[in-house]
Each structure stands twice: as structure tokens, then as C-alpha cells.
Swiss-Prot record:
Name of the featured protein: Cytochrome c-550-like protein
Organism: Trichodesmium erythraeum (strain IMS101)
Keywords recorded for this protein, A-Z: Electron transport, Heme, Iron, Membrane, Metal-binding, Photosynthesis, Photosystem II, Signal, Thylakoid, Transport
Lineage of origin: Bacteria, Bacillati, Cyanobacteriota, Cyanophyceae, Oscillatoriophycideae
List of residues binding heme c: C75, C78, H79, C129
Xref: InterPro entries: Cyt_c-like_dom, Cyt_c-like_dom_sf, Cytochrom_C550, PsbV_cyt_c550-like
A cellular-component GO term for this protein: photosystem II
Length: 165
């Protein structure tokens, strides 16, 4: 009786170990947000303009989804759909990002803005946009937010539009 009980425990332990090895060692695929799938055309990594020279940096759908999620947690109160509730004439559209001083239509400049926000003409700091310090978010997190904003400005319908009718 004791040997049979011991054998059953041994077999169950082996089965659990095999199950853990099989299921826990397979790569975990990060969830891709449905908005990113539907509107940002990011099934394969997409090149986001890195600097004014036009160099590109690739971002996966997972990176953009993480950027969207972080944007939703921290920026959405003022920037629903790429709008700007504090200053409606300055949205997050690609046109408005290009028109800022300095332009914010590339990853490096938009990250610099998020780290040290200035008003649209660049003449002074803004108190309305939260400064994202390195203690708060990593460089990759801020780049994912910026990549999400830039890709949405390129691809998402009605992103940053002043009047949707």
C-alpha cells in the first residue's frame, strides 16, 4: 500500500514537472492592443522617424501597445484621441507636432519634450504637461509612448483632429 501511494505521488510529481517545463518555457507573447492592431498597421515592426535626418527606429506592435497603455494611464486625461484639452488649437496631430519649436515630429525631439515639456513656441516651460523624469519612467517606456503618439498621428483616423463631425 505504501509503495503504491509513493509510486502515484512520484508519477504525479513527474507529470507536474513535465507540464511546467512544456508550458512555462515557451516564449510569452505580449498582448497586442486591439487599437494598435486595427489602426496603427503594425503587424510587423514599423520604422518611426528617430531624428531630423530621417533615420528610423523600429517598434513592434507590442512596443506600441505598451506605449498606448502608458499613454492611457498618464496622458489620456488631457489628450483623448490626440486632442489637447488644455490648449485645443495645439493637438498631437503630425502637422501640429511638426509646427512646434523645436519640432516634435521625431522620436528624439518628442522624448526630449516629454522629459522637459515646453510650451508650443519653445519659449518657456509648461506647467500643464507632466515632466517624465528618468526616476519615473525608463528611456524605453518614454520612447514607446512617443512611438505610439507618432504612429497614431501618422495612421489613426481622427487622431489629433480639432473637430470630428
Amino acid at each position: 500500500m505504501l509503495n503504491k501511494s509513493l509510486l502515484i505521488r512520484f508519477v504525479l510529481t513527474i507529470l507536474i514537472i513535465v507540464q511546467v517545463i512544456i508550458f512555462d518555457t515557451q516564449p510569452v507573447q505580449a498582448a497586442v492592443d486591439s487599437y494598435v492592431k486595427r489602426y496603427l498597421d503594425a503587424e510587423i515592426p514599423v520604422g518611426i522617424k528617430l531624428n531630423k535626418q530621417g533615420e528610423l527606429k523600429n517598434f513592434s506592435a507590442e512596443d506600441l501597445s505598451e506605449g498606448k497603455q502608458t499613454f492611457a494611464k498618464n496622458c489620456l486625461n488631457c489628450h483623448v484621441g490626440g486632442a489637447n484639452l488644455v490648449n485645443p488649437s495645439v493637438s498631437l496631430s503630425l502637422e501640429k507636432l511638426k509646427g512646434a519649436t523645436p519640432p516634435r515630429d521625431d522620436l528624439n525631439n518628442l522624448v526630449a519634450f516629454l522629459r522637459d515639456p515646453m510650451i508650443y513656441d519653445g519659449s518657456s516651460y509648461t506647467l500643464f504637461c507632466r515632466q517624465i523624469t528618468e526616476n519615473w519612467m525608463s528611456q524605453q517606456e518614454v520612447e514607446n509612448i512617443a512611438a505610439f503618439i507618432l504612429r497614431a498621428a501618422q495612421k489613426a483616423p481622427y487622431w489629433g483632429v480639432e473637430n470630428v463631425r
